[in-house]
């Protein structure tokens, strides 16, 4: 789960991280009130969307010379003018795609005198089962661009959760960023604060870009992005309360209500599969036959008829879907339950696109019999390759 920048900074501030003062604003009036509280002399008006590249982004409906989604201004009146221009508009960045995202809230923050910019992040390293710390002197840029152009400027080290942060880690961070004296001590303190927050809140990623050195020689978190492990949210009602559903795909929100693992993609063939590995294999073979998957959807090992029906309805709600492939290997999951769910869903929502069903495993013959006797126009497949080939042919033939 992702949260907005202003929320991320509030979370980090709880652990003592140095963040600039600022206030969220949902209206122009709230933006003005925030600026008046801050007092100036410099304000930063930031669009709050779940995407990077806001500063270089462009608002739809404004000219090519218009300012982006992060604006530095020097008066309360300028805050008012820019807030009025930004709120309610769609901001397009390199991460949003051409559709962009509507700006429904702003963050009005005090300006900072910047001497240097750094990059700092904490990530879960699944290979080593440790927390990976990534640091670079090239802050304020996309880390992917830095990795491509100057990989030698990216430094990383791992922290073992069994032992936590040691002085050696602090020295490694200071060396990576070229910090000495008081700034090196501040970096050591900050690393401890960030690591504690990372573990305490079950984060999947903590990214600060940029982490700055101010002109009076102090570290400050100028921008922050936090992502949380969705499977651990039950332990953090405070974090769960920060969820902004307007930033998420409605289909993914609906899927979460049924504990379905659903991720929307850009293809034309909807997939309903049980098991993450089989789901990925299904997506791969669809691509092998020349089409693109419209989603990743894992119904899990113990899905009920109602859960399968919900999954089918979520897939068909995507207007980009031109065909559906159901691929089930019944171990814990029974094929007859899948068949009943598919039939119930088709009868409820109707079937406007080709549907191929491949069943194998527990009660497979009963499942096939249920589908065969349903009277619905469902194409049966013998195996995964056969199913992928049939759905791709059906979709391309209907095009």
From Swiss-Prot:
Job of this protein: Succinyl-CoA synthetase functions in the citric acid cycle (TCA), coupling the hydrolysis of succinyl-CoA to the synthesis of either ATP or GTP and thus represents the only step of substrate-level phosphorylation in the TCA. The beta subunit provides nucleotide specificity of the enzyme and binds the substrate succinate, while the binding sites for coenzyme A and phosphate are found in the alpha subunit.
Keyword Glycosyltransferase recorded: no
Classification via InterPro entries: ATP-grasp, ATP-grasp_succ-CoA_synth-type, ATP_grasp_subdomain_1, Succ-CoA_synthase_bsu_CS, SUCC_ACL_C, Succ_CoA_ligase-like_bsu, Succinyl-CoA_synth-like
Known catalytic reactions: succinate + ATP + CoA = succinyl-CoA + ADP + phosphate; GTP + succinate + CoA = succinyl-CoA + GDP + phosphate
Pfam families, A to Z: ATP-grasp_2, Ligase_CoA
Cofactor: Mg(2+)
PANTHER family in the cross-refs: SUCCINATE--COA LIGASE [GDP-FORMING] SUBUNIT BETA, MITOCHONDRIAL (PTHR11815:SF10), SUCCINYL-COA SYNTHETASE BETA CHAIN (PTHR11815)
Protein name: Succinate--CoA ligase [ADP-forming] subunit beta
Keywords on record: ATP-binding, Ligase, Magnesium, Metal-binding, Nucleotide-binding, Tricarboxylic acid cycle
Pathway the protein acts in: Carbohydrate metabolism; tricarboxylic acid cycle; succinate from succinyl-CoA (ligase route): step 1/1
Residue ranges constituting the ATP-grasp domain according to the UniProt record: 9-254
Positions of ATP binding: 46, 53-55, 109, 112, 117
Cellular component, GO, one term: cytosol
Residues holding substrate: 274, 331-333
Residue positions binding Mg(2+): 209, 223
Co-factor remark: Binds 1 Mg(2+) ion per subunit.
Gene Ontology BP term (one): succinyl-CoA metabolic process
Keyword Ligase belongs to the record: yes
Superkingdom classification of source: Bacteria
Family: Belongs to the succinate/malate CoA ligase beta subunit family.
Subunit text: Heterotetramer of two alpha and two beta subunits.
SUPFAM superfamilies, A to Z: Glutathione synthetase ATP-binding domain-like, Succinyl-CoA synthetase domains
GO molecular function, one term: succinate-CoA ligase (ADP-forming) activity
Listed EC numbers: 6.2.1.5
């Amino acid at each position: 789960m992702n949260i907005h920048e202003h929320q991320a900074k509030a979370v980090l501030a709880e652990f003592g991280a140095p963040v600039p003062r600022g206030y969220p604003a949902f209206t122009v009036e709230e933006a003005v009130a925030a600026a008046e509280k801050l007092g100036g002399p410099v304000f930063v008006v930031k669009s709050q969307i779940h995407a990077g590249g806001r500063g270089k982004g462009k608002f739809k409906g404004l000219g090519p010379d218009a300012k982006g989604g992060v604006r530095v201004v020097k008066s309360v009146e300028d805050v008012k003018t820019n807030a009025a221009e930004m709120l309610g508009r769609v901001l397009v960045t390199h991460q949003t795609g051409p559709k962009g995202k509507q700006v429904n809230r702003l963050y009005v923050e005090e300006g900072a005198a910047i001497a240097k910019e750094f990059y700092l992040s904490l990530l879960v390293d699944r290979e080593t089962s440790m927390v990976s710390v990534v640091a670079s002197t090239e802050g304020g840029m996309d880390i992917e661009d830095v990795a491509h152009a100057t990989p030698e400027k990216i430094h990383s080290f791992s922290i073992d959760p069994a032992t936590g942060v040691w002085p050696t880690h602090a020295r490694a961070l200071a060396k990576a960023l070229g910090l000495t004296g008081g700034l090196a001590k501040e970096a050591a303190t900050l690393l401890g604060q960030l690591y504690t927050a990372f573990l305490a809140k079950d984060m999947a990623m903590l990214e600060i870009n940029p982490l700055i050195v101010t002109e009076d020689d102090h570290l400050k978190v100028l921008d922050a992005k936090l992502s949380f492990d969705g499977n651990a949210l039950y332990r953090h009602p405070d974090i769960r309360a920060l969820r902004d559903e307007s930033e998420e795909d409605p289909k993914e929100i609906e899927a979460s209500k049924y504990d379905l693992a659903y991720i929307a993609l850009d293809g034309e063939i909807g997939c309903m599969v049980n098991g993450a590995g089989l789901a990925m294999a299904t997506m791969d073979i669809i691509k092998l036959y020349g089409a693109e998957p419209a989603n990743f959807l894992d119904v899990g090992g113990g899905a009920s008829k109602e859960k399968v029906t919900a999954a089918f309805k979520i897939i068909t709600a995507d207007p980009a879907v031109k065909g559906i492939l159901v691929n089930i290997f019944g171990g814990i999951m029974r094929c007859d339950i899948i068949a009943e769910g598919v039939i119930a869903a088709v009868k409820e929502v109707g079937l406007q696109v080709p549907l191929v069903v491949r069943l194998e495993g527990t009660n497979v013959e009963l499942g096939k019999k249920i589908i065969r006797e349903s009277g619905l126009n469902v194409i049966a497949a013998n195996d995964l390759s056969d199913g992928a080939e049939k759905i791709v042919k059906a979709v391309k033939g209907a095009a």
